[in-house]
Swiss-Prot record:
One of its GO terms (molecular function) is protein transmembrane transporter activity. It comes from the Eukaryota. It comes from Mus musculus (Mouse). Residues 1-142 are annotated as: Required for interaction with STX17. The gene is Tmed10. Glycans are attached at residue 179. Disruption phenotype: Early embryonic lethal. Decreases the protein but not the mRNA level of Tmed3 and Tmed9. Heterozygous Tmed10 +/- mice are viable but show structural deficits in the Golgi morphology, such as the formation of dilated saccules. Conditional knockout mice show a increase in serum interleukin-1 beta (IL1B) and inflammation levels. Cargo receptor involved in protein vesicular trafficking and quality control in the endoplasmic reticulum (ER) and Golgi. The p24 protein family is a group of transmembrane proteins that bind coat protein complex I/COPI and coat protein complex II/COPII involved in vesicular trafficking between the membranes. Acts at the lumenal side for incorporation of secretory cargo molecules into transport vesicles and involved in vesicle coat formation at the cytoplasmic side. One of its GO terms (biological process) is COPI-coated vesicle budding. A motif (COPII vesicle coat-binding) lies at residues 211-212. This is Transmembrane emp24 domain-containing protein 10. InterPro entries: Emp24-like, GOLD_dom.
C-alpha cells in the first residue's frame, strides 16, 4: 500500500519533541457538563495568558418545559470584575474575546425560577490559544494546502509552548526575587530583635543595680 509521499512503512516511535507537542496540544480546551439546580449559581475559573483569543459555546437544556419562569444567566468576568460577556435568559450560543493580560477568568451560570423544577443540564466548551483559531477559515483565506495548514498549526502550538515556558521562567524569577527579599527582611528583623533584647537586658541590669543600691543591698 502506498501513500501520497511514497510507500507506507510501519509507524515508528514519535520523536520526543512531537510527542511533547501532542501531549500539550489539548491543554487549552475545556469541555465540561454539569447539572444546575434552580436558584443556584455555579462558576468555573481558569487562568489564561495575555493576548489570547478565547472562544466558547454553551447549551443549557431546560427540562422544566418552561414551568416556573425558569431563566438562566451567563456572565464571564476577569479578576477585576470587568464583564467580558453577559447573556440573560441564555439557552444556546457562542462567545469570543481576547485577553488583555494574564488573569483568572470566571464563567458563571445562575439559575432563577420558582417551584419544584428539574435541574438544568449545562454543556460548556471553551477553547483558547491555538485551539481557538479556525484553521479551516485561515486555509480558505490564505489558500493553504492541508499540509501547510497542519504546519501552521504546529508552528502556532510550538510558539504557544515557548511562550508558556518563558512565562514560567519569568514567574520563577519573580518568586525567587520575592523569596530573597523575604529572607533579607527576616534577617534584618532578627538583627533588630536581637538588639532590642540586648537593650532590654542591659536596661534591666542597670535598673536592678539601681534598685538594689537604693535598698542598700549592694554597694
Amino acid at each position: 500500500m502506498s501513500g501520497l509521499f511514497g510507500p507506507l512503512s510501519r509507524p515508528g516511535p514519535l520523536p520526543s519533541a512531537w510527542l511533547f507537542l501532542l501531549l500539550l496540544g489539548p491543554s487549552s480546551v475545556l469541555g465540561i457538563s454539569f447539572h444546575l439546580p434552580v436558584n443556584s449559581r455555579k462558576c468555573l475559573r481558569e487562568e489564561i495568558h495575555k493576548d489570547l483569543l478565547v472562544t466558547g459555546a454553551y447549551e443549557i437544556t431546560d427540562q422544566s418545559g418552561g414551568a416556573g419562569g425558569l431563566r438562566t444567566h451567563l456572565k464571564i468576568t476577569d479578576s477585576a470584575g470587568h464583564i467580558l460577556y453577559a447573556k440573560e435568559d441564555a439557552t444556546k450560543g457562542k462567545f469570543a474575546f481576547t485577553t488583555e493580560d494574564y488573569d483568572m477568568f470566571e464563567v458563571c451560570f445562575e439559575s432563577k425560577g420558582t417551584g419544584r423544577i428539574p435541574d438544568q443540564l449545562v454543556i460548556l466548551d471553551m477553547k483558547h490559544g491555538v485551539e481557538a483559531k479556525n484553521y479551516e477559515e485561515i486555509a480558505k483565506v490564505e489558500k493553504l494546502k492541508p499540509l501547510e495548514v497542519e504546519l501552521r498549526r504546529l508552528e502556532d502550538l510550538s510558539e504557544s509552548i515557548v511562550n508558556d515556558f518563558a512565562y514560567m521562567k519569568k514567574r520563577e524569577e519573580e518568586m525567587r526575587d520575592t523569596n530573597e527579599s523575604t529572607n533579607t527582611r527576616v534577617l534584618y528583623f532578627s538583627i533588630f530583635s536581637m538588639f532590642c533584647l540586648i537593650g532590654l537586658a542591659t536596661w534591666q541590669v542597670f535598673y536592678l543595680r539601681r534598685f538594689f543600691k537604693a535598698k542598700k543591698l549592694i554597694e
